[in-house]
Amino acid sequence: MKRLGLAALYIGSALAWPEPHGPPSRNVPRDDFPMFNPLPSTDLNTRLIRCEYPSMKGWTYSNKKNGDWLKYVGSKPGEITEYNIDTDNDKYVPQGITRKYHLEVTDESVNMDGTMFDQAKVFNKQYPGPWIQITVTNKLKHNGTAIHWHGIRMMENMFNDGVPGVTQCPIPPGSSMTYRFKASQYGSSWYHSHYSLQYADGLFGPMTIHGPTSAGYDKAVDPLLMTDHLHSSAFEEYHKELEGKPPAMDSIILNGKGDYDQTGDLKKKYRTVLKPGKKYLLRLINTSVATTFVFSIDGHKFQVVGSDFVPIEPYVTDHIAVGIGQRYHVILEGLSEEEAKKNGRYWVRTTPAKGCSKFAPGRGTDDRTGVIYYNKDDGVSPTTEIGAFSLDCRDEPLEKLVPKVKWTVPDPGLNMVGAFEKPADVQLGKWHRPGYPDTDNLVSNWEFGPSPMWINYSEPIIKNLDKDSFPSTWVVYPADDYVNDKWVYLVITGKKLKPLSSQVAVAHPIHLHGHDFVLLQQSMEPWDSTEVNLKLDNPPRREVTLLPAGGFIVIAFKPDNPGSWLLHCHIAWHASAGLALQVLERKEDLKALTLNNPDFDFMQENCRKWDAWHSDKTNYWNPSGHFQDDSGV
């Protein structure tokens, strides 16, 4: 994973690999460059990663006192000679190495429960597989933070889902939190802050979990992150959403590069070189604030082999609409040598979908955000044209998204008629924000029916499981009376919205935490419970889908993961304005998971730290104002 220059927060990662399967030691003289092990774990069976800085000749590891890290001992000192706890890492960061971790999938004999199992499939010859841990250190001044690992199921592990006010209190400035989870899925996704509008300011990055694909390829290309960008902080622009006039984005970015002035300067474009006749895996990730993109490469077609974290039967297309939070794995087949000689340069396009974007006047019109060259990057601009295809804001056709692993969903039958009569309606309204004087002007809000979401950072629901009821602004939907062989069915409608109005996108990207859901029906027509036509035999499966404004979706999931799972619109302005709810799944089982659980204990300690920080108003950006001005998520 390459650093794309998108993060506004220092994220340090430490991966714990049980012996004997840790990264191998490198046979390099210790005085050549800094190379050392961090302080060992208290668990003697765990070995931490080795820290390596091969480009930092003349530096050495320094541990004379607490807080030391690196010290320059060479003969040509530069601007800085030490990296320690007092170093401003907004300005100075030691240059380490790019790390890649590989998992081997093998057949093994494993004794899990006292009986030998001869047909086990395991990672790195061990069961369970290697344990991944990520430590996040908050060095912001006026904000807490929490990091969400988008699409990771967090099976029986709600504590690490990273949603402040739901799964944890925010990490206060000066504190750290280690997220622990098992990667049981594979594909590509992203991690991002779920604290208010932080990710809109750049707090996100890509992640890939390697695994099989449903079609072959020769090489993989780095993750392609397509996003929209504001030149001012989203926190400063948010008032426009409250006033009914959503902020306009300034430019389109692909992998950290954009051309705001739309000059066509190739230095401002993403560029890569391909070989004719080779097949390349592209990992497409939409990390936008408010834009659905249509991805294409002039003159090329590709096979789609995965949607979100779900491998699918391959199909061929020349373009693909990618909603916010959605991901696709596609395989691009390079042109033949003869074709490549005729024209060795092609535009990569991330085109804003019709009705699902808003840019400042004259901005966001140049969708040529990248170039692929054949054999050599000669620095010359392509002259290719965009293909003749639809730029509508809609999901890929459901009949094309066929999961490789087939699921058959039970027919909800007559028992669900009552539930189908009470769908969750996406509504646009006005309200007085909690904690604000009633004399304040009404502001715009979004909601899934009963109330806009407005969480309490100091009282996440995980701390309040003994309560029988919750504040209406927490928007809690209980899912208690289910067992593993039953399903939860949800109908979400946008029937009260008017598409293409000043504040309504043509489609809302709806994301569910903690689960893959099946998409049983999706329509641009108004919801009518008497005309239900569900696809129950191997329906599309993912965790983000587009809800058409004026239409509806019917989704379902297995209630096999106790937790309180956020369901929200991934248009950042809409989530901040309240368009979210939480599904409280199997509350009693969730309570049992909190017993003797170090993650639950850490959550409580982190909340105490948060409360101490939050109680001092001098820590606020505006000490005399309101600390919270949006939903919190």
Swiss-Prot record:
Propeptide stretches in the record: 22-47
Class in the EC hierarchy, top level: oxidoreductase
Binding site for Cu cation 3: 194, 513, 568
Required co-factors: Cu cation
Glycosylation sites: 143, 286, 456
GO CC aspect terms: extracellular region
Signal peptide: 1-16
Cellular compartment(s): Secreted
Residue sites binding Cu cation 1 per the record: 148, 511
Entries under PANTHER family matching the protein: MULTI-COPPER OXIDASE, OXIDOREDUCTASE TPCJ
CDD domains: CuRO_1_MaLCC_like (cd13854), CuRO_2_MaLCC_like (cd13880), CuRO_3_MaLCC_like (cd13901)
EC number(s) given by UniProt: 1.10.3.2
Molecular function, one GO term: copper ion binding
Residue pairs linked by disulfide bridges in the UniProt entry: 169-607
Protein name as catalogued: Laccase ARB_05828
Top-level taxon of origin: Eukaryota
Alphabetical UniProt keywords: Copper, Disulfide bond, Glycoprotein, Metal-binding, Oxidoreductase, Secreted, Signal
UniProt KW DNA-binding keyword: no
Oligomeric form and interacting partners: Monomer.
Family that this chain belongs to: Belongs to the multicopper oxidase family.
Domain Plastocyanin-like per the UniProt entry, residue ranges: 224-353
Cofactor note: Binds 4 Cu cations per monomer.
